[in-house]
């Protein structure tokens, strides 16, 4: 008799995705981040659901409702810190996942890559709106500054900002709509993740060598289920150490002060995972130019398949491009550091240089080096 997992309509889908899925035999730990991101999303949805049961999206009570969750709700402090630090963990996994895709040429699976970019943008939007909800000082001023960037759009900018605010400043209407969107977006992300997987399983996984692996596939279970479980255990260990020992290390102390429209914090900055983009935004003196650079710093990922000049898919056997890739990684860390610094010398100059280098590396240096490597290999 045929196994039920191969005949039952629902089990069949799970079977083809997680059990009998033909997987390259040589994929490394860098391929663990997909499952870790799925885990992060589930943790965020579950903790978020419990937080939403006690949270009130009103400007007068939002801050105190978060304090109430931490003080009076059973394990409320744990749920709140798991949700806040879960977002940081989500972005660590997300950036490593994208970096892996860039390194091993996964962007040549166009549909999977483009859905992935949509996922990245959706997660960024969700995280930004979630940061506004506790209604602390940085929540309020962060929301004011970032939404105000839309006013740089010619002709419709000012009207667009007021339409998003629901008034003439960030207020009750803004908070309520941000809560509504923050609640619904993770479910859209879940649907997009399923489409991401659907397209991935159409073409099959890439592998570190970048070569076709049809002749050497193994079933996903037990080989990669056990590998993913190991990744999950290590991630959970790191996560719980972060949540239980230093839950506020990645947050901003200003957010423990209730929002006050009359007092501007000395340094307005977003959460750490947006600092690289914020540094690129600040490095251009012109408002519209800064906004365009900010948007393009993420959307540049769409161009990667067009900028792939090498005859090899992966960077595994391309040492010169590898060097540039790691310079890019260091550059992004530099931008993250600069984004958290005040706007003064020498940080302005460092930020401008790092921003120029970021675009130069992706748009010119890496493609040209790829061509040069092909020439060196007499291809």
Swiss-Prot record:
Give the residue spans that cross the bilayer: 33-53, 77-98, 113-133, 178-198, 226-246, 288-308, 320-340, 347-367
Cofactor annotation: heme b
Annotated membrane topology is: Multi-pass membrane protein
List ligand-binding residues for heme b b566. Answer: 97, 196
SUPFAM superfamilies named in the record? a domain/subunit of cytochrome bc1 complex (Ubiquinol-cytochrome c reductase), Transmembrane di-heme cytochromes
Q: Which residues bind heme b b562?
A: 83, 182
Has keyword Iron?
yes
- Which Gene Ontology terms cover its molecular function? metal ion binding; ubiquinol-cytochrome-c reductase activity
Q: Could you give the cofactor binding note from the entry?
A: Binds 2 heme b groups non-covalently.
Q: Which amino acids does the record list as binding a ubiquinone? A: 201
**PROSITE patterns recorded for this chain?**
CYTB_CTER (PS51003), CYTB_NTER (PS51002)
Miscellaneous note of the record: Heme 1 (or BL or b562) is low-potential and absorbs at about 562 nm, and heme 2 (or BH or b566) is high-potential and absorbs at about 566 nm.
Q: Quaternary form? A: The cytochrome bc1 complex contains 11 subunits: 3 respiratory subunits (MT-CYB, CYC1 and UQCRFS1), 2 core proteins (UQCRC1 and UQCRC2) and 6 low-molecular weight proteins (UQCRH/QCR6, UQCRB/QCR7, UQCRQ/QCR8, UQCR10/QCR9, UQCR11/QCR10 and a cleavage product of UQCRFS1). This cytochrome bc1 complex then forms a dimer.
The entry sums up its family as follows: Belongs to the cytochrome b family.
Q: What does this protein do?
A: Component of the ubiquinol-cytochrome c reductase complex (complex III or cytochrome b-c1 complex) that is part of the mitochondrial respiratory chain. The b-c1 complex mediates electron transfer from ubiquinol to cytochrome c. Contributes to the generation of a proton gradient across the mitochondrial membrane that is then used for ATP synthesis.
The name this protein carries in UniProt is Cytochrome b
Q: What is the organism lineage in this UniProt record?
A: Eukaryota, Metazoa, Chordata, Craniata, Vertebrata
């Amino acid at each position: 008799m045929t196994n039920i997992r191969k005949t039952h309509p629902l089990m069949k889908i799970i079977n083809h995705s997680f059990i009998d899925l033909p997987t390259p035999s040589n994929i490394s730990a860098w391929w663990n981040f997909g499952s870790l991101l799925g885990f992060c999303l589930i943790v965020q949805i579950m903790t978020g659901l419990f937080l939403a049961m006690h949270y009130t999206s009103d400007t007068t009570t939002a801050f105190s409702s978060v304090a109430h969750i931490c003080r009076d709700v059973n394990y409320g402090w744990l749920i709140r810190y798991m949700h806040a630090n879960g977002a940081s963990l989500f972005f660590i996994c997300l950036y490593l996942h994208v970096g892996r895709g860039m390194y091993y040429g996964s962007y040549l699976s166009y549909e999977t890559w483009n859905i992935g970019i949509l996922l990245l943008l959706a997660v960024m939007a969700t995280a930004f709106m979630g940061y506004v909800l506790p209604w602390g000082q940085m929540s309020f001023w962060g929301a004011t500054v970032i939404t105000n960037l839309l006013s740089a759009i010619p002709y419709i900018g000012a009207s667009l900002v007021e339409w998003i605010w629901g008034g003439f400043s960030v207020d009750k209407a803004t908070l309520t709509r941000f809560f509504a969107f923050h609640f619904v977006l993770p479910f859209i992300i879940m649907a997009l993740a399923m489409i991401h997987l659907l397209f991935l399983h159409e073409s099959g996984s890439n592998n570190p060598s970048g070569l076709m692996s049809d002749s050497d596939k193994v079933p996903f279970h037990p080989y990669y289920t056990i590998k993913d479980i190991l990744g999950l255990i290590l991630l959970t260990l790191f996560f719980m150490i972060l949540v239980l020992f230093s839950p506020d290390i990645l947050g901003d102390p200003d957010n423990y002060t209730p929002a006050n429209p009359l007092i501007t914090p000395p340094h307005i900055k977003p959460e750490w995972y947006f600092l690289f983009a914020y540094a690129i935004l600040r490095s251009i003196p012109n408002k519209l130019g800064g906004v365009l650079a900010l948007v393009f710093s993420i959307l540049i990922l769409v161009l990667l398949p067009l900028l792939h000049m090498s005859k090899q898919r992966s960077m595994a056997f391309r040492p010169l491009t590898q060097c540039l890739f790691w310079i890019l990684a260091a550059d992004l860390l530099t931008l993250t550091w600069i984004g958290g610094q005040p706007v003064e010398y020498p940080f302005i100059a460092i930020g401008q240089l790092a921003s120029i280098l970021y675009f130069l590396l992706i748009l010119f240096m890496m493609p040209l080096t790829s061509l040069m490597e092909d020439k060196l290999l007499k291809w």
